[in-house]
C-alpha cells in the first residue's frame, strides 16, 4: 500500500464505471495516506454502507432493509413514567459504552408509551452509534442470521420486537430463548434485544393445554423462563385520573395552548370526558385528545 501514490489511484479511478455518487460520508484529502487514520476513526464511529446512512431498519426477505421515514418522537415528548424510562436510558447508555447491559422487556397496558420509549431512545442516541432493527415476531427464528449479518459492524444494534407473545403451540420461542441467553451463539457484544408486550408471561396457555399436559409444571416453568430471560423487565400501567390529567396539561404546555387562550379547567374537564368515552385513560389517549384540540384551534372550531 505504501508504494501506491496519487497518480496510481487516479489511473485506477479512471477504469471504474461512471457511478453517480453523493456527498462523501467522510472528509477526503488529496493525499489519501494522510487521511487513512481519520477514515478508520470515522467509520469505526459511524459505520459503513447502509449503517452510516440510516439509523433504523427492518428485517424483510432475509435482508436488513433501511427505513427511510422514522417516528421523530423524542424523550422530551413523553410525559411522566420517569422511573420506567430512566431504567431504559441507563441500560442503553451502558450498552453504547460497551459495558454490561441487559435485554429489556417493556410490558403493560396498551397506549402507555412502551413502543414510543424505544423509538425515542433511538432518536436520542443514534449519533453515538446506536442503530435499530425491528423484526416481526414471525422472524424470531432468524435472530441468529440477523446477528451474523451485523457481527462485524462497529455500530451498536437494538433488535426490536413489538407486541411480543406466543401461542403455546408456537415453537419459535425457543430461538428467542437461545438468543436471550444460554446458547453458544446467543451472546453478541454489539446487539441487544428490546421487546414490548401487553403480557407479562409471553406464552399464552389455553385450557386444553392444561387438561392434556401431564407435565403441566414443566410447561409452566418453560413459559415463565422465557420472560425471565430478559434481564430487565419494566412495567407500564395506565395512569389514574390525576396522572392522566397531568399528562394532558404537560402536552398542552408543549403545544403553547395558553397562547390561544385555552382555559385549563375546561381542557382538563374535556380530556376526562374524552377518556371516559374511549374506555380508559392512557398517555396515548391524552395525546390523541391534544391532537384533536390543536386541530380545532387551528381551524377556528369549537372543541
Task: Map each language-model feature to its residues.
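Interdomain "pre-motor" coupling segment immediately N-terminal to P-loop NTPase/helicase cores
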Residues: 6-66
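N-terminal pre-Walker A segment at the start of P-loop NTPase domains
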Residues: 68-93
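Walker A/P-loop
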Residues: 103-133, 137, 145-152
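Loop/turn-to-beta-strand initiation segments
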Residues: 130-131, 154-158, 187-194
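Conserved P-loop NTPase "ATPase switch" module shared by AAA+ and STAND
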Residues: 136-137, 152-172, 176, 199
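Conserved catalytic/switch belt of AAA+ P-loop NTPases
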Residues: 168-211, 218
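Conserved AAA+ ATPase "SRH/arginine-finger" region at the nucleotide-binding site
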Residues: 213-224, 231-245
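C-terminal alpha-helical "lid" subdomain
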Residues: 237-303
